[in-house]
Amino acid sequence: MMRKAVLTLLALACLLLDFENLEATAGNEDRILVVAQHMEAAFRKLEDYTCDVDQIFYQDGAENQRYLFKFYFKKEKKIRVDFYQPHSGLIIFYHDEEKEATVVPLRLLSGLKFRLSVDNSLMKTLAGQRINQTDMGYFIKFMFKNLRTVEQKETEFREDNERVEFLFWAWDYVEEKSAEKYRISISKKHWLPIRIERYNLEDRRLEVTDIRNYVLNAHLEDKLFVP
């Protein structure tokens, strides 16, 4: 009799734990959705922005390559990237819906230009990300899509007065073929990401991107995006 009562209590305890885990997961998904909605609303108000990006790629858990660049964006999807490291002086220009981007290898030799397909391997990051997948509008759509289609397994959500940080499960950013984890930090000042860490399912670090010095709605001139 006593054994049966103990087993019943254990079963109830397990059910309660499962319920709490489901509730926590659902709660985190709801909170991440609210963050994504804040980001979407903030992005709608943007006409342009610039930021400094420090992007590190890892191989076998160790730092492999590092890229430093300034990113310019103007609606509707005009993009300019000025590299500091490596390829100092290299500039990439891209306009929405175009199948090619313009590359200026050296800032001082602006007359020297190349047109390359956005699918060219030279125009992709080490993770395979294309130039037309680099703006915040694309990233926000990526978040909404994966909130609808991917279960948010682990529960990790932290918030203070300045930022929100959470663990986000998603298909890979580029081809959507392999599952990955992202640890994302969002500034509550402008509701844009300030740090994105990417991991595989074995918790091996793949990529870390720090985004700093946002300047929003600076009325960037169109000529800035002309090669």
What are these regions (language model features)?
Residues 54-58, 82-84, 104-106, 171, ...:
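A generic structural motif
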